[in-house]
Design a protein with these regions (language model features):
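Conserved active-site regions of diverse hydrolases
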Residues: 29, 33, 61-62, 207
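Short glycine-rich His-centered loop
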Residues: 2-32
Length: 220
């Protein structure tokens, strides 16, 4: 497993990462400052399966953030925390605002700017961390002809290209959900096709940890 004793993992992102965490940065166990999403599940699994490793999990997600917003606070809420590992999960609102607020272009982040924002954050992260996770944005819409799904796929592709270019760990949440929805309807996870319930949080945590050499069956 790639996370070592004493490592700190900072998860940055939007509401999908935030999920009720303490803002701007949440960590610890009292009153669930890590929120109720995939970050909480990841820490649960790390602690229960690797209790001998003191791994510090930090949630730096803020609801409503676009890549522009996250970049503006990246130095303060991510880099300054001296993380060993950084996860960047952003882009859903970059796309969503184009559909739920089409008359307000100042809230939109288009593909070229998304690529620039992601590039700058990845370059900052690579300078200070052992490793960087690039998590794709997603929409829980299996119909690839859906307009918002087609747009989201453009941003997912940018993540794939940047992860390869900068040798980051790619966590493809869109592909993970697509596989799940071959068996279950998206309403099982989220009525708005974005914010996951506990089943979705568990799926996302499992997908993330699958990239980390995590062993659920190791003896303690």
């Amino acid at each position: 497993m790639i996370f070592e004793n004493g490592d700190r993992i900072v998860f940055s992102g939007d509401s999908v990462t935030d999920m009720g965490s303490t803002n701007p940065v949440g960590e610890g166990h009292r009153e669930d400052p890590l929120g109720r999403g995939y970050v909480r599940v990841i820490e649960n699994l790390l602690m229960s399966c690797y209790p001998e490793r003191l791994i510090r999990v930090t949630n730096s997600g803020i609801s409503g953030n676009t890549s522009k917003d996250l970049l503006a606070r990246f130095d303060r809420d991510v880099i300054s925390l001296n993380p060993d590992w950084i996860s960047v999960c952003i882009g859903i609102n970059d796309v969503w605002r184009q559909f739920d607020m089409p008359e307000m272009p100042e809230y939109h982040v288009y593909p070229d700017d998304y690529r620039k924002n992601m590039t700058e954050m990845i370059e900052k992260a690579k300078k200070c961390a052992k490793g960087v996770f690039v998590c794709t944005p997603y929409i829980m819409e299996p119909e690839k002809g859906d307009k918002m799904r087609k747009r989201m796929d453009e941003y997912t592709q940018i993540c794939k290209e940047l992860a390869e270019k900068y040798d980051c760990v790619l966590v493809d949440f869109q592909n993970m959900y697509d596989k799940f929805f071959a068996y279950r309807h998206s309403a099982v996870i989220a009525w708005d096709r974005i914010h996951p319930n506990q089943v979705g949080a568990t799926l996302m945590a499992k997908e993330f940890l699958s990239k980390c050499g995590f062993d659920y069956n190791r003896e303690i």
